[in-house]
Structure formats: C-alpha cells, structure tokens
Amino acid sequence: MRCRYQQNERKYDGVLQRGWYRGFIFNADFPVPDSAIAVLGLFYFTDKESSRLTSLVLFFFMGDTVSGDLPPERRQGAAPVSKRAKYYTRGRIIMDFMTGKTEKKTVLISDILSGEYEGKEVLLNGAVHKIRDMGEVAFVVLRTREGLVQTVYEEGTTTPELKELCEEAAVTVKGTVALEERAPQGFEIRAVSFEILSKPVEPMPIAINKWKMNTSLETKLDLRPLSLRNVKERAKFRVQEGIVRGFRDYLHSQGFTEIHSPKIGARGAEGGANLFRLEYFHKHAVLAQSPQFYKQMMVGVFDRVFEAAPVFRAEKHNTKRHLNEYTSLDFEMGYIDSFEDIMEMETGFLQYTMKLLETEYAKELKMLGVTLPKVDEIPQVRFDKAKELVAEKYNRKIRNPFDLEPEEESLIGQYFKEEMDADFVFVTHYPSKKRPFYAMDDPEDTNYTLSFDLLFHGLEITTGGQRIHDYLALVDKIADRGMTQEGMEQYMMIFKHGMPPHGGLGIGLERLTMKILGEDNVRETTLFPRDLSRLEP
C-alpha cells in the first residue's frame, strides 16, 4: 500500500475538467481481468492552488491502468450526462449529485399565456375536471394549479380511447397550443395523447366540477378534502395565502423578525377559563391562547417581531364568527411613542396587502366577485364615544358600558360606512376592566386603556394596544387584579431586566378573509374548521 498523487479527469455538468486526487492506492501486482475491480481507493479532490477540499469520493476503478494520465481512448468513453451532475473516471460513473436544477418538461398556463408556445407542441399536467363528449370530438377540461385548461380530443387521432379517461384522473396531455377565445384561458390544447398517471377507484360524492356547488356548508366540510378541489372554493384560500404573504412581506420590509413560539405551555397568556387543558408527561399543560408572552419576550431580543400561527380558545360559542382554533397574525414592536404607532403599522399592512391582492390575485378576486375594501385612511373613535354615537343615531340604549355587543359593533361599522364611506374603523380606549392585566392604562384616565379593536364592516378582526413595560407598574396591576405571579416568573423576568415601551396586536386571519370575500360564516374561509362539533377532517 502506498500514497500516490495522481492526475485525473472529471466530468461535471457535461464539462470535462482536470482535477487532482490523492489517497491510498491498493495496487494489484498480479494480472487482473479488465472486467474485474483492480484498484480500490478512497480519494478526495482538492483545489490545486488552495488545497481546499472539494469532494470526498470512494472510487472503484475498472481495468488495469492505475496511474498517470488517462489514455485518450478512455477519455472518450464517458456515458451521457443527465440533468444530475456526475463524477466520471476511466469513462465510468462513480456517483452523482443533486444540484438544485430541474429540467422543465411540462408547461404551465402562465407559460402558454406568454405567447411563446402558440402553435407548438407541449406537455401539461392536470386532473381531468370535466369531459364533454360531442361525438367525434370531446372537450377534456383539465384542472391545474393555475386554473382550468381546455383540451380537444379527436376520435381516431388522440390516444388512448376516450373511455379510458375519467373525471379526477391525473394525466399528462401532449398536444399543440391553439388560440381559442371561447376556452377558459383564451387557448386550447389540441391533444395528441393523454398519459394516464392515476385513476380514481370511486366516483366523486360531490359535484366539484360545477361553478357553484349546490350543497350545504356542513356537507362541504364533511367532504372538505374533495370540496376544496372546486375552483371557487380553492380560490378563497389563494386569497387567504395572499393575505399572509402580504403580512410577512410588509413586516419584513419594516424591520420585523419572524418568530415561532410554542403552542403548549404551563399557563395561558390571557387567563380565564377558555383554555384547552391536557396532560403533558404527568404535568398539567394548556394549548396556547395567544403568543403574547413570547412576543413580548422577543421584543427584548429583536425589537420587532411577528408570527403567523394557530391559537386555541375553549369558548363554547356556536356562532358564524367563532372558531376554537384559528390562525392569528401577531406582531409586537418596541420603542413606540404611542399606541397609535401600532394602528399606523396595521394600516400600512392593510394598504400593502390590498395592493398585493389587486395585482397578483386579480384572477381569484374576479372569480369570486370581490371588490376590495378602502384602506386609504382608517378613522378612529374612542370606545365611549362610539357607544354614544350608535345609541343616538339608531335609538339604542347602552346596556353594557364595559364592552361592545355584537350588534353595537355592527352598527358602528354601519355608522362609519354611511357617514364616512369607511370600511374599517379603529375603536380605541377600551375599559381597563375588559382588557388583560398587561394592557397599559391611559394615564389621563386609568379606567380606560391605551388599546384598540379594528372593526371591518362591523366585525372585530383585530385586538391590540400598548403594554405595560415598567416592572413595578406591572406588579401593581397584577396585585390590583387579585392575581398571583406564580407561573409567570420567566415573563416577569424580562421587565426586571429592562424593556422598552412596546405594543402589538393579533389579527384573526379567517375573519379577515371572510370579510374581504363577503362570506357570512367564518367556516367558509377556514380550511379545516375546529368548532364545538367538528374535529374531522
């Protein structure tokens, strides 16, 4: 056994390159047939100039030449290079590597709409959405991730036989692109063949290929994995994706850092009885009502943080606006001058997101018949003033001075739409009695807090405000509430060691989506709702 430096050639992405390897050579001193493995070596490639390690390769050399330059006849023996990078030596593949590059074989609707493929043969993947058999010709509509595509099947020309195709079969169609104004996308594919990738074993229990499914919400939810294949149903969740995308993009642009807080804890951030309790390795635990404590902790780390994640509320409500699990869009920001900074940040998010939906989700909005709300300016009104306005305008008595009843929220939304043509309104300075212990009281009137709700067409979609950042003030507030600090030691720790003035909010994603789309039930805009009666699917 001896150490030997040897010059070698390697082929990477089809380019012949000269490299150097070194390693221990196990040499055979006796004749070995060409078909046998003559040499086994463990080598590593290095950059000749910097000696930087570039790869570690286990080589199995075939044949009887083990040193020196490769013979010319060997250099020509390399196998064809596929889309994967391969190492060759002596004309043989040693191993291949993933490079992150994919070879595009099929096209998308957006590719065809660019005009590049008109009159050309293409491959396109999709599920058979609907088949309209017209005799010698059939229209096979495919459902793709970008929408519906009409393909033309010609008897005697297209393969396989039409009877082999069925709705919901996954296929790859091969055909020529032709302009057709009457087709869903303004073009059609004149099919040469359909490759059937898979076929269903049972017919659909629900007519998902109709523009509007004529069925109840409960049936749609029972069959949710299938009902979501309806193009209008899935369009709702494309819009919802746009909302979350807007939330992330806008806050990133404002210097926020995304965090991921735990959803199992020892206690709830909001207190109260609306907690889901569970056993956690012989300990008591709860599902997170909110990421509130963790958001505040992370303000001391990053100044500005946000999270889009599920929260859990064990509230026994059975209404069109309540869920027991929903997605909360939360942010918390430090070094604020006023709780109005938080409202301004939310206004900026809404403006950015509506523009994003208008430009990049126009197809879905048109399909759903949505007109986006106005967010140029959002009015704000004090809690007590809002109650007075509604009572006076709509001849309604104030029954609960400490909170807004659902009917009052609706009337506040109606009032500002009628008087100011406003779709949103901030209601500020909620009573301290109805806000959590960490809410900062208004120094001018401690019966009220520096907090707010955002109403959208009369429905609360956001709760937020400024938090207490002074340790002693927080201790006093906890004592005034008759609470104990037990179980909150880590939370209180951040205030002992200094926190900046800060505040934040939480937005209910499903509620916001519901109001944007004009739905009247939050379950319509929840992928798989969890409520009093539903744990499946």
Task: Provide a role label for each language-model segment.
Residues 83-94:
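Short, Lys/Arg-enriched N-terminal segments with co-localized hydrophobic residues
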Residues 96-336:
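Class II aminoacyl-tRNA synthetase-like tRNA-binding/catalytic domains
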